From Swiss-Prot:
EC number: 2.4.1.221
Membrane-topology descriptor: Single-pass type II membrane protein
Any one cellular-component term (Gene Ontology): endoplasmic reticulum
Protein name as catalogued: GDP-fucose protein O-fucosyltransferase 3
Pfam families named in the record: Glyco_tran_10_N (PF17039), Glyco_transf_10 (PF00852)
Cysteines joined through disulfide linkages: C381-C384
Alphabetized UniProt keyword annotations: Disulfide bond, Endoplasmic reticulum, Glycoprotein, Glycosyltransferase, Membrane, Signal-anchor, Transferase, Transmembrane, Transmembrane helix
Gene Ontology MF term list: alpha-(1->3)-fucosyltransferase activity; peptide-O-fucosyltransferase activity
Catalysed reactions listed for this entry: L-threonyl-[protein] + GDP-beta-L-fucose = 3-O-(alpha-L-fucosyl)-L-threonyl-[protein] + GDP + H(+); L-seryl-[protein] + GDP-beta-L-fucose = 3-O-(alpha-L-fucosyl)-L-seryl-[protein] + GDP + H(+)
Provenance organism: Xenopus tropicalis (Western clawed frog)
GO biological process, alphabetically ordered: positive regulation of protein secretion
Length: 471
């Protein structure tokens, strides 16, 4: 009995001691955490306080150096923070200019040009009043849907210098998505007609890859109608009916080699732009040409001026209805001889379009080429050289040259929706929005011009009040 009691006593003591040990450990852990938080908080604050004088000194020294550097050179002020550069001396041949996104340079007497990026163009935050010596320059390589108001004469003619996708701009960017002629001639992804015919057992003749649905071109409505008459494998979010492998199923993989190998298996690829404007040509056209497929193209009405060969793409605009287009594609799909006429240029690397050849060989910038300037560098240097040209002219003859943008430098027609049989169209608020938005942008462009010509700052309320007056 005594032994039993003694055993129970020692067991109880063991659990009591264990309990106190656990409690003690927990307290120590919590104290440690508290001390760590206190130490960490003190260290961060202490380091920040120590760094403040040093950072201030470095910043003051850096700003002082930049101010000193720019004193002897014309200043090119990016009003849009596109480059992210606080200050840089840029060498453009024998000319040098100071490029910056720092708006405090606006009042500097050496500031000669204000550079804008079209997508970021904000009409209620402009460098007004505009000095006589300030030339405005517009860089806008993107679709009109990003900023429709710039595509009307009252707005585009506010600028002196332009770099847009239009061949008529001062620095045309029409070929911005084409690395070079070798990319077109390359046979890296080219698949034989025999293998493509074999692959047709599990693939549709046409591939469609779009995730920007219901854009101004209304391409999804056309493709939806086309799908009634011919099979289309649609990999993107728009009209999706086939999945890509997981490893390439994201936008960043569109330039991935594995994705290219998948598309290269198709005989035809639907190449539909998001907007219909002359010279607005994107990777939608160049990608199938590089892969050895036949692009079925809808977009720039003058695309034939840019094709490598007369018979290298099927132009959607030549067909009265998607059904007629489907019939033609089926004909080529069944007849290797007819199909191969569209691949002949690729097999022999025969690019006979003189306009395309001269554009690529003569352009002053490159695409994904570290040995060349990119098109932003070329844009900056174009303006820098023009500013210096006027500096030299003024020294010699007291007159300067005036550059002005024209309506053709950025010009697109109103977006039009396709109208097939009732009840067969895609219903989308976005689809219905584009034409009213375009018409509204005309009034916005007119209001913008009126207020800028007044040459003083204006508010958002003033802008919209004027827009509504033009209704």
């Amino acid at each position: 009995m005594n032994r039993m009691w003694e055993k129970k006593f020692w067991i109880s003591c063991f659990f009591i001691i264990l309990f106190f040990i656990l409690v003690t450990l927990q307290v120590m852990v919590e104290l440690g955490r508290f001390e760590k938080r206190e130490t960490k908080s003190f260290t961060v604050i202490d380091i920040k306080e120590q760094k403040k004088p040093l950072l201030k000194h470095i910043k003051e020294k850096s700003n002082s150096r930049l101010r000193h550097l720019k004193d002897n050179y014309p200043i090119m002020l990016w009003w849009s923070p596109l480059t992210g550069e606080n200050g840089r001396l840029g060498q453009c041949g024998t000319d040098t200019c100071f490029f910056t996104i720092n708006r405090t340079y606006l009042q500097d007497p050496m500031t000669k040009a204000i550079l804008f990026y079209g997508t970021d163009f904000n009409m209620t935050s402009l460098p007004l009043p505009r000095e006589i010596s300030h030339e405005w320059a517009l860089f806008h390589e993107e679709s009109p849907k990003n900023n429709y108001k710039l595509f009307h004469e009252p707005a585009i003619t506010l600028f002196n210098h332009t770099a847009t996708f239009s061949r008529h701009s001062h620095l045309p960017l029409t070929s911005q998505y084409l690395e070079g002629l070798q990319a077109l001639r390359s046979k890296e992804y080219l698949i034989s007609i025999q293998k493509k015919n074999f692959l047709r057992k599990r693939l549709a003749p046409l591939a469609y890859v779009q995730s920007d649905c219901d854009p101004p071109s209304d391409r999804d409505s056309y493709v939806q109608e086309l799908m009634k008459y011919i099979a289309v494998d649609s990999y993107g979010e728009c009209l999706h009916n086939r999945d890509l492998p997981q490893q390439v199923n994201n936008p960043s993989s569109m330039d991935d080699s594995q994705f290219h190998h998948i598309l290269a298996q198709y005989k035809f690829i639907l190449a539909f732009e998001n907007a219909v404007c002359e010279d607005y040509i994107t990777e939608k056209l160049w990608r199938p040409l590089k892969l050895g497929a036949v692009p079925v193209y809808f977009g720039a009405p003058n695309v034939e001026n840019w094709l490598p060969s007369n018979k290298s793409a099927i132009i959607v605009g030549r067909f009265s209805h998607p059904k007629e287009l489907a019939t033609y594609i089926k004909k080529l799909d069944k007849n290797d001889k007819l199909y191969m006429q569209f691949i002949e240029w690729k097999l022999h690397g025969n690019i006979n379009n003189k306009h395309l050849l001269s554009t690529i060989t003569e352009r002053k910038w490159g695409v994904q080429d570290v040995t060349q300037d990119n098109y932003i560098d070329a844009f900056e240097c174009m303006i820098c050289k023009r500013v210096w040209e006027n500096v030299r002219l003024k020294d010699r003859v007291s007159t300067t040259k005036l550059w002005n943008a024209e309506s053709l430098h950025l010009n697109c027609p109103a977006p039009e929706a396709f109208s097939f049989l009732p009840g067969h169209l895609l219903k989308s608020s976005m689809r219905e929005m584009w034409k009213p938005s375009f018409e509204q942008s005309k009034k916005e462009a007119k209001a913008l011009r009126t207020l800028v010509d007044r040459n003083r700052n204006f508010t958002t309320v003033e802008f919209w009040n004027l827009v509504f007056k033009f209704q």
